[in-house]
């Protein structure tokens, strides 16, 4: 299964590369390189709930993974799993994700959030995710239930930590599962809570 995942990602990269060569683009670790490419949607193959995408050479963003999905990604070099789901949500998952991740030799970063006072979307979450990205020794999986929260966190990370313009960050997150019509309350979006300010207030150079 992991061979098919790699082939799909490589094929997508080749379709846009003038050289026709699938080249690596690191986004994790202390020595990440280059600009952030657009996500590539991959077939979930029943291993991830609803959404599965790859960004660059070493970041995956998805809905809830199955046991086999985690095993396949480990075989692909994933060393860090970042989970945004709340404890009640994880209680409904038919296996112990934290235990499996550790059993497979990966680091488990648990950042539960629901947009509630108890589990808020906050700038601290972006900081924690950025630390996980820079500290990763290999590839990273970021997931929630259907990649909606993950898409908003990814957009905030791009804006806050990678100096990606707001419009570009939102467009790339839409390619995963941003869904602008789903909001926290009124007109507020999770990405704004992650940033700690409205998108219209984001500094010059990131609009």
Identify the residue ranges that each predicted region occupies.
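A phosphate-binding catalytic loop at a beta-strand-loop-alpha-helix junction
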Residues: 141-153
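Coiled-coil-like amphipathic alpha-helices with heptad-repeat character
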Residues: 2, 20-21
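Bacterial N-terminal signal peptides that target proteins for export
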Residues: 1-9
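Helix-centric, low-specificity signal for extended rod-like, repetitive segments
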Residues: 18-19, 142
């Amino acid at each position: 299964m992991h061979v098919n995942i790699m082939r799909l990602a490589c094929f997508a990269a080749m379709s846009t590369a003038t050289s026709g060569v699938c080249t690596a683009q690191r986004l994790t670790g202390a020595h990440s390189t280059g600009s952030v490419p657009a996500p590539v949607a991959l077939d979930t193959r029943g291993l991830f709930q609803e959404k599965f995408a790859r960004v660059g050479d070493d970041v995956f963003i998805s809905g809830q993974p199955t046991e086999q999905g985690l095993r396949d990604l480990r075989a692909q070099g994933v060393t860090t799993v970042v989970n945004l789901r709340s404890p009640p949500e994880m209680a409904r998952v038919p296996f112990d994700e934290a235990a499996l991740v550790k059993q497979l030799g990966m680091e488990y970063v648990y950042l539960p959030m629901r947009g509630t006072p108890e589990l808020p979307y906050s700038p601290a979450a972006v900081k924690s995710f950025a630390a996980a990205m820079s500290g990763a020794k290999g590839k990273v999986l970021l997931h929630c239930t259907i990649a909606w929260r993950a898409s908003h966190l990814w957009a905030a990370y791009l804006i806050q930590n990678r100096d990606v313009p707001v419009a570009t960050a939102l467009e790339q997150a839409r390619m995963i599962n941003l869904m602008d019509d789903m909001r926290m309350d009124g007109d507020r979006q999770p990405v704004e809570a992650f940033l700690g300010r409205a998108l219209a207030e984001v500094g010059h150079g990131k609009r």
